[in-house]
Structure formats: structure tokens, C-alpha cells
């Protein structure tokens, strides 16, 4: 993997990330394909219609069903899904956190019960990499110890100690496996934990900087803290994250979150929001969100967003989409998801262009000036 920052505007960075499967312009948003597919969309939609260069798949879900060994027999995620660009796989730590009534963390890893059949499993720093080797992702995330916020200082301290310990185990194991010819084209990212405790974040980031990770992520945010606390935490930890490596903010977020955190120096994002909101009838536009379920759109001949050049907006009206949603027609999920993902990917493109010409501050002012905070 190669990463190069080609332009800076304040702390905002414009870069190029190259993997074995694609050249990725950063800052980048990664659509979430939890089980190897972005909900309601296929590989053609992702590559030919949306031109996405990288998507995220989930180790926890692929491990449980169909199993990473099955995926390996199809040629990994690329052969299985037919999406021939880059995949990032997360470690499953967040799923263990979100299903924490069925999980128990200890110093060795995470014990959990399958949400599918109740069977018991144990993730360790090595086992999650073994699963990701079989999945064949371009970027693998290490196992980390995530805590809900707010958290007691004692629990945050335990979290960063475990995360650093697991990071060392993971990077040593990855080097060993590569010496055996495994995962030679796969890259590994460390994850900085620490809640909203700036000193804990600094300590964790500095420890991970000393390890030869290909990139660094900020984990454990957007889990209950305010937006301001998230932004302040990112701003506080960023000076302690290696400038030469890509920086990934996990599980974030709204369009506003993307703009605010690009301004603070983040290069990579993922979130289920654009596709989840699409399925629920909330569509993103340059002027804010619209609720396509509303009766006021029944006779509306306009596209979702007159300024949008997506597949859906060039072909279909708000009135038609309102009808499809109310009829629970499956076509709606695809058309709405294509629109929302186009909006997110185009937002990233606009930010890259603004950074290139040194006008990110102007872009941010215009972004907020034309947006309504209310659902329209």
C-alpha cells in the first residue's frame, strides 16, 4: 500500500491511497457492505454507477455466515462479491460492543455469542487476522477494546492498555504471517482508543505510532458522546497521529461530521447512515434532508435534488419515489440508496477539490449556508 498527501489546506488533507485493487482519492467515504454487499446494491452499482473505489465489509458477520473459509474458496471477498476494487474489513470489535449483552472482554480477547444461533466464539488479535486473511481484504483492522461513553477513567485505562497489547500482538503476528507468504498484499491499521479522555488518546496514539501499521484509525467515537465532544476529541488526538499514514475515523457519520472532521485532518470515513436512512425514506440533498414519505411529495415532479447528477435524480421524480416507498416496492431501496451514496461520495469529491485550490474554509461556509437543519 502507498499513501501520499499531495495537498494541505489548514489541517485538511488531500491524498492518494493505492492498494492492490484500486487507487483511492482521499478524503474518502467508504460505503458499508456489512455482509459483503451494500444493502440493495450489487458490484455493478458500486463500481459502474457510483464509481466507489473502496467499500467496508464486516469480519464478525462474514465469520459467522457464510464463514471466512467459504469466502476464501470463492477467491476472497473480491471473487465472492465480484466487486474488484478495494475492501476494508473491520475486526468485529464494534459488533461485540454493540451486542455487549452477549459478550465478555478479557485480556486475551472477546468472547461472544452468535446473534444467529447462540453459539459461543472467541475473537483474539490473531484469530481476527486469520479470518481477514481468508477474506482477502486490502485493509485489515486490528481487534480493539471499545467502551461505551461516558466511561469511568478506570475502564478507559483498561481499554487503552488492552488495545495497545492487542495491537502489538497483531502487528507481530502479521509480520510473521507475511514471512510465511500470507497476506502479502494486505495492509493492517491500528486503532486508537481512549474515549473522550485526551491524555488517554494521546498515550494510545503515541504507542501505536511506534508500531509499523500501514494506517491509524480513531475508534470509540459516535457511541454516545455529543458532536462537540467528538470533534474536540478528534482535534486533540490528531497532532499525535503520524502524518505520513492515512487517518481513519470509524463509524462516522452525518454530512456535517464528514466536513468537520476533514477540516481536522481525517482521510477516511465509513457509516451505514446513507443507506440506512435511504431505506427509511430520508434522503440527503445539498439543501438538507427530505422525508420522501411526506404527503407533500405525492404530486411533486422534481427530482430529489435539482442539483444532483445521480442515477436516480436524472431519471425519477419525488412523486414516483414517494409512491414506491408507500407501496413498499423493493425498487425504492435501490434508487434511494444510489442517491444517498452518490450524495456522500460527491460531497467527498467537492471537499477534495476545495482542498486542492486552498478554499476549504469557503467550501465549509457555503456548505452550511445552504443547508436547513430541519427535515424538509
From Swiss-Prot:
Entry binding sites for substrate: 90-94, 144, 193, 220
Residue ranges of the region described as RNA binding: 251-257, 275-279
Reaction(s) catalysed (UniProt annotation): 7-aminomethyl-7-carbaguanine + guanosine(34) in tRNA = 7-aminomethyl-7-carbaguanosine(34) in tRNA + guanine
Highest taxon listed in the record's lineage: Bacteria
UniProt-annotated catalytic positions: 90 (proton acceptor), 270 (nucleophile)
Cellular component GO terms held in the UniProt record: cytosol
Protein name as catalogued: Queuine tRNA-ribosyltransferase
Enzyme class: transferase
Amino acid at each position: 500500500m502507498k499513501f501520499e498527501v499531495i495537498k494541505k489546506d489548514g489541517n485538511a488533507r488531500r491524498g492518494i491511497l493505492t492498494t492492490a485493487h484500486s487507487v483511492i482519492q482521499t478524503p474518502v467515504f467508504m460505503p458499508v457492505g456489512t455482509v459483503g454487499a451494500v444493502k440493495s446494491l450489487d458490484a455493478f452499482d458500486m463500481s459502474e454507477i457510483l464509481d466507489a473505489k473502496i467499500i467496508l465489509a464486516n469480519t464478525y458477520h462474514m465469520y459467522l455466515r457464510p464463514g471466512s473459509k467459504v469466502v476464501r474458496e470463492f477467491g476472497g471477498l473480491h471473487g465472492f462479491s465480484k466487486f474488484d476494487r478495494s475492501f476494508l474489513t473491520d475486526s468485529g470489535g464494534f459488533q461485540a460492543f454493540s451486542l455487549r449483552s452477549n459478550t465478555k472482554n478479557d485480556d486475551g480477547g472477546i468472547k461472544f455469542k452468535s446473534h444467529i444461533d447462540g453459539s459461543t466464539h472467541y475473537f483474539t488479535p490473531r484469530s481476527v487476522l486469520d479470518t481477514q486473511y481468508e477474506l482477502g481484504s486490502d485493509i485489515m483492522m486490528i481487534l480493539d477494546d471499545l467502551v461505551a461513553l461516558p466511561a469511568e477513567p478506570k475502564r478507559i485505562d483498561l481499554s487503552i492498555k488492552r488495545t495497545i497489547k492487542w495491537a502489538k500482538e497483531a502487528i507481530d503476528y502479521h509480520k510473521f504471517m507475511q514471512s510465511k507468504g500470507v497476506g502479502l498484499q494486505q495492509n493492517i491499521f491500528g486503532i486508537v482508543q481512549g474515549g473522550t479522555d485526551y491524555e488517554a488518546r494521546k498515550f494510545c496514539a503515541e504507542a501505536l505510532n511506534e508500531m509499523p501499521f500501514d494506517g491509524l484509525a480513531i475508534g470509540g467515537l459516535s457511541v454516545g458522546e455529543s458532536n462537540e465532544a467528538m470533534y474536540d476529541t478528534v482535534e486533540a488526538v490528531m497532532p499525535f497521529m503520524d502524518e505520513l499514514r492515512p487517518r481513519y475515523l470509524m463509524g462516522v457519520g452525518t454530512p456535517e461530521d464528514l466536513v468537520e472532521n476533514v477540516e481536522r485532518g481525517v482521510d477516511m470515513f465509513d457509516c451505514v447512515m446513507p443507506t440506512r436512512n435511504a431505506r427509511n425514506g430520508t434522503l440527503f440533498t445539498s439543501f438538507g434532508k427530505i422525508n420522501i414519505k411526506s404527503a407533500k411529495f405525492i404530486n411533486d415532479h422534481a427530482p430529489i435534488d435539482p442539483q444532483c447528477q445521480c442515477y436516480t435524480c436524472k431519471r425519477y421524480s419525488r412523486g414516483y419515489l414517494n409512491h414506491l416507498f408507500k407501496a413498499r416496492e423493493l425498487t425504492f431501496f435501490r434508487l434511494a440508496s444510489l442517491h444517498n451514496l452518490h450524495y456522500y461520495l460527491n460531497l467527498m469529491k467537492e471537499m477534495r477539490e476545495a482542498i486542492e485550490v486552498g478554499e476549504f474554509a469557503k467550501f465549509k461556509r457555503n456548505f452550511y449556508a445552504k443547508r436547513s437543519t430541519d427535515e424538509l
